[in-house]
From Swiss-Prot:
Record key words, sorted: Mitochondrion, Repeat, Transit peptide
InterPro entries assigned to the protein according to its UniProt record, in alphabetical order: DYW_dom, Pentatricopeptide_rpt, PPR_At4g14850-like_plant, TPR-like_helical_dom_sf
PPR repeat feature ranges: 235-269, 270-300, 301-335, 336-371, 372-402
Gene Ontology terms, MF aspect: mRNA binding; zinc ion binding
Gene3D superfamilies: Tetratricopeptide repeat domain
Family affiliation: Belongs to the PPR family. PCMP-H subfamily.
Ranges of Polar residues composition bias in the record: 56-71, 78-103
Main subcellular localisation: mitochondrion
Organism in which the protein naturally occurs: Arabidopsis thaliana (Mouse-ear cress)
Lineage of the species this protein comes from: Eukaryota, Viridiplantae, Streptophyta, Embryophyta, Tracheophyta
Pfam families, A to Z: DYW_deaminase (PF14432), PPR_2 (PF13041)
Keyword Isomerase: no
Protein name: Pentatricopeptide repeat-containing protein At2g15690, mitochondrial
Length: 579
């Protein structure tokens, strides 16, 4: 009997279901093609015939997007796998679950859905009101009395892929106290669909070339190079200014950075700019980098050879400069007037006097170049820098033309360089006779010398320097010892301490008047009178030493002690060695 009652109940339920489907089909003929009936009527779940928006329709459904924070204020529902009934059906799961528009009925989940491959979904179909796929059962819902349910609030707007919409059916005040999201985030404003993510984070434009050139003109070389690292693209004029700035700065680090940016530019094949790079590295005393740039140049001109030879000569490598000159002639390049000026500079560096005269003769005889004033001055520089002052003076007098003031001025500088005071005074007189305006220059007060802020003393001290002396140190030491015995003999009687003889001689060297004279000679120009004031009586050894010093350096030394003034001139004192 119980089995018959179960069959009747099932048949009665099917009749009601068939009537509902026929009514829905007659109301919306366009949906008739979307219905598919399988062998049993239980394949159509009643849930798909409802348009109610349950709060947990997205739960465990991979096809629907995740709802926002305020659309899931209720805890997840649990269902009995056997009875398929909600264990929390006595508790409202959403604000609209027991509304009058739903007829006060709890939706039942039964049957199989052909949309899911014949399997029953855990919570029924997806709701179009909550961003899911459109259900196949559109139109009027028979469970709502044949009318479409009306929901209070506006239809959610879908602004983008993030589905940042607000469900007006669920109010913030009705959120359940049983469930709190772990990470509550504020809803983000919708982003326009035609706005790309790259436009959200705007990148600052690279610095302009004018900014780099402006910093170079203000001598802010480091800041200018930092703009290159930030993406500035210098043009040809900007590279010229950068190379000149690095050459004046004499900083190898900055020069290499600028050269790296130059190699990445489109001007790396410009011969003029490459010549400036050679000159820049030569000023920074980096001959290796200058030679590397010179070797990698495809189109070398005469300026390239001249600049490389000058870089060798300025850094004391005159032999390499002369070898480069021979290599240039082997390549078939004909030297010009400027070429021989660099050759004379290289000869002066290595002391090649004979070689300089040979090149001077070949310039006239072999290459047909008429010597100019610059070439005669170049040969004079070879003689003067090597210390052959007598030969240099005779060379000036044997010139085929009347010497100008430039020759006598150069000769005066060479005499001052080697400490020949008499020759220096004589050359200055000849210079003034030829050009009286030269004498006026010394009377005009000159401005204080500029501070060389561009020079990095730490960098210059880290270089390896090589010094050469033409005489042997042993012979020079013997000569100095011999002169010491003839010219000056320390008088140790004025040392009252009980120490040995050598210590007494060392103690005499640290008397205050001697230190003052040494400091004055270093800091003052030649032949300037020095005045030393002392509060004690000058000792006899210092008195004898100052007389000899006044004759050697050619100055007038005035010493004031607690007794009187001592005027030392030409090895004599005004006191007559009595004070």
């Amino acid at each position: 009997m119980s089995s018959l009652m179960a069959i009747r109940c099932a048949r009665t339920q099917n009749i009601v279901t068939i009537g509902s489907l026929l009514q829905l089909r007659s109301s919306f003929p366009r949906l008739s093609s979307q219905f598919h009936f399988s062998g049993t009527l239980n394949s159509i779940p009643i849930k798909h015939l409802s348009t109610s928006a349950a709060a947990n329709d997205y739960h465990q459904n991979p096809q629907s997007g995740s709802p926002s924070q305020h659309q899931r204020p209720y805890p997840p529902q649990s269902f009995d796998s056997q009875n398929q009934t909600n264990t929390n059906q006595r508790v409202p799961q959403s604000p609209n679950q027991w509304s009058t528009q739903h007829g006060g009925q709890i939706p039942q989940y039964g049957g199989q859905n052909p949309q899911h491959g014949g399997q029953r979904p855990p919570y029924g179909g997806q709701n179009p009101q909550q961003g899911g796929q459109m259900s196949q059962y559109g139109g009027h819902n028979p469970q709502h009395g044949g009318h479409r349910p009306q929901y209070g609030g506006q239809r959610p707007q879908y602004g983008g892929p993030g589905n940042n919409y607000q469900n007006q059916n669920v109010q913030q005040s009705n959120q359940s106290q049983y469930y709190t999201p772990q990470q509550q985030q504020q809803p983000q404003p919708p982003r326009s669909s035609n706005q790309s993510p790259n436009q959200m984070n705007e990148v600052a434009p690279p610095p302009s070339v004018e900014e780099v050139m402006r910093l170079c003109q203000r001598r802010l070389y480091k800041d200018a190079i930092e703009l290159l690292d930030k993406g500035a693209m210098p043009d040809r004029e900007c590279f010229v200014l950068l190379f000149e700035s690095c050459a004046n700065l004499k900083s190898l680090e900055h020069s290499k950075k600028v050269h790296d940016h130059f190699l990445q530019s489109k001007f790396r094949g410009d011969p003029k700019l490459n010549n400036m790079v050679i000159s820049m590295f030569g000023e920074c005393s980096s001959i290796t980098d200058a030679k590397r740039v010179f070797d990698h140049m495809v189109d070398k001109d005469m300026d390239s050879w001249h600049l490389m030879m000058c870089a060798y000569s300025d850094n004391g490598m005159g032999d390499d400069a002369l070898h480069l000159f021979e290599e240039m002639t082997k390549h078939g390049l004909k030297p010009n007037e400027e070429t021989f000026l660099t050759v004379f500079l290289a000869c002066a560096t290595v002391g090649g006097i004979e070689e300089a005269f040979l090149h001077f003769d070949s310039m006239k005889n072999e290459h047909g170049i008429s010597p100019k004033t610059e070439h005669y001055l170049g040969v004079l520089g070879v003689l003067g820098k090597c210390g052959h002052l007598v030969e240099a003076e005779q060379y000036i007098r044997d010139l085929p033309f009347e010497p100008t003031a430039d020759f006598w001025e150069a000769m005066r500088n060479y005499a001052r360089l080697h400490g020949d005071i008499d020759l220096e005074d004589y050359m200055e007189e000849l210079m003034v006779d030829v050009d009286p305006s030269k004498a006026v220059i010394n009377k005009i007060p000159t401005p204080p010398p500029k501070s060389f802020k561009e020079t990095n003393m730490v960098t210059s001290k880290s270089r390896i320097l090589e010094f050469r002396n033409l005489t042997f140190y042993k012979d020079e030491a013997k000569e100095m010892a011999a002169k010491k015995g003839v010219v000056y003999v320390p008088d140790t009687r004025f040392v009252l301490h009980d120490i040995d003889q050598e210590a007494k001689e060392q103690a005499l060297l640290y008397h205050s008047e001697r230190l003052a004279i040494a400091y004055g000679i270093i800091c003052t120009p030649p032949r300037k009178t020095l005045t030393i004031i002392k509060n004690l009586r000058v000792c006899g050894d210092c008195h004898n030493f100052i007389k000899i010093m006044s004759k050697i350096i050619g100055r007038v030394l005035i010493v004031r002690d607690n007794k009187r003034f001592h005027h030392f001139k030409d090895g004599k004192c005004s006191c007559g060695d009595y004070w």
